């Protein structure tokens, strides 16, 4: 089965966002700056310090991101990043870290299937943090 990896777009703050996610989730972060990339001469000069491509890899997941020209970026609520945790402690800890500076839309609480919490992080990305019952 193929892997499904989220690719996030940002309005000039990809480096800050991906660094924040690394602090929350751990893993290895790689960043490619527009001005140091093979396509640098094809990009407008004002984008030279923006992120062309980034990747955050942990043992269990990988997600990527880049900056986008502000006039082309569309924010919406049709997609959530869902973290499935192994314990209640991990669920609450990751929820608290990701919610820092953002908006806690639904605190972690118990449902028939386990725990769930929903938040919008300080970069406008929507997350669900869950822990299923065994």
Regions found by a protein language model. Give the residues of each.
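Glyoxalase I/VOC metalloenzyme domain signal
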Residues: 1-110, 118-134
